[in-house]
Amino acid sequence: MKRFLPLATVAVTFILSFTVLATPPTTEAALADRILGDPNAPVTIVEYSSLTCSHCRKFHVETLPNLKKTYIDTGKVKLIYRDFPFDQLGLMAAVMARCAMSDRYFAFIEVLYEQQSNWSRSKTPFEALVKIGKLGGLNPADFEACLKNEALVDGLVKKRLDGQKNFDVNATPTFIIDGDHKIIGAEPYEEFDKILAKKVK
């Protein structure tokens, strides 16, 4: 266990949403937690995932849509996404997503997971990521600058180490629910529902 909207639909939505190139956020802003849902939701899921992890893709494509519909979009649960890259390519993709403006973050990782087999297996993965970044409004020069930002790269690595230290995360995806439940792997929606249904009562 390193552990779809149809792809065309996702790509078109991505392009139409972000046609204007934007200045990347500061390092501090780039490293801030990315929260899906209402920040004040009573229940918190912390997700540790790698953008090159096939099981993480499975969760985002098959399970997350149902979690969003039932719990996240209804204000009952928020999901905090934390990068846990296992390899240099996963780290590179994480840097790219973090260099997008925060309101574009989940759109970026949605496309990265949907197209994972394309860019992660490409003979020229950097160029493949650059193309995705351009579709999302990230200037290639800014992407390269972000990759050279040692504070950003080191900060992402530190988040992985913090996950290992604080929650004994050693595989992706790993989910910590309110600090007292752990789910490891791309478990189906029903496994999350068993825990969340009790917490939101």
Report residues per predicted region.
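Short clusters of hydrophobic/aromatic residues that line enzyme substrate/ligand-binding pockets
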Residues: 35-36, 119, 183
